[in-house]
C-alpha cells in the first residue's frame, strides 16, 4: 500500500505510526478504568479544560502541550477534591471547568499576535503529521509506566472501578488511587491531543472499551483487549487518512465506530438465524 511504501522515506509518517500505536495502548488501558468507573464525563471535562492551559502557553510563547498538561492535571485533581469534599456536585464542577477551560484557551489564543484559525484547528481536531520524536518519546515513557502499573496494581484499580466501598473495606487506599488515576487520565489525554484533537479525543478512551465490552464483561479481558482494538483502529484510520487524504482523527473514529456497529449487530443476526432454524 502507498502508506507503507512511503513509511521508510518520510520521518513524519514513522512518528505518526509510533504515536498511534503508543496512544492506542495508553488510551485502551486508561479508558477501561474511565468507562468502568463511569468517569467519561469527567474525562471530557479534563480534555476540554486542558485547552485553557494550552491557550495560555501559546500566548506566552511556551510549549502548549506543557501548559495543557499543567492545566489538565490541576483540573483533574480539583474535580476529585471537590467531589470528595462535597463542596460542589462533581457534575457541576466538571461543567464549570469544561466551559471555563475552553473560554480561557480561545481568549488567549486570539490575543496572540499572528494568530490564525489554523492554530486553533490543529489542537481541536488534531494534526498527527506534526507529532515530533519528542512526543513519541513522551508517549513511550507514559506507555511503559502505565503497563507497569497495570501489571502491579490491576486488582486494586479493578476494585476501585466497580465498587469504591468494597475497595475501602479491603484496605485499599481509595483516595490516593482516585487522585493518581485522575492525574493519569489527564496526562494520557494531553499527550494524545496532537493525534486526535480535543474534540475527538474522548472517543478514543471510550470506543475501544465499548467494542470489547460488547463481547466480554470481564474487566481483565477488557483491559487486555481494549488497547489492541485501539491500536488496530488507530493504525487503520491513519492508513485510510493517508491514502484517501482525509483527517486522521476523523478516520480513526469512523473506523472504531464502524467496528462497534458491526460488533453490536452480530448477536442480533445470530439470534435471527437461530430463530429461523
What are these regions (language model features)?
Residues 6, 10-15, 94-152:
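Transmembrane helix-bundle core of multi-pass membrane transporters
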Residues 1-25:
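Membrane-interfacial amphipathic/re-entrant helices at transmembrane-helix boundaries
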Residues 49-59, 97-108, 130, 174-179, ...:
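Small-residue-rich segments of transmembrane alpha-helices in multi-pass membrane proteins
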Residues 32-115, 212-224, 241-244, 268-269:
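Short loop segments and helix-boundary regions at transmembrane helix junctions
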Residues 246-277:
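Cytosolic-side transmembrane-helix boundaries in multi-pass membrane proteins
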Residues 16, 64-70, 91-95, 140, ...:
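Loop-to-transmembrane alpha-helix initiation sites
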Residues 132-208:
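Helix-loop-helix "hairpin" substructures at the membrane interface of multi-pass membrane proteins
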Residues 195, 199-250:
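Transmembrane alpha-helical segments in multi-pass inner-membrane proteins
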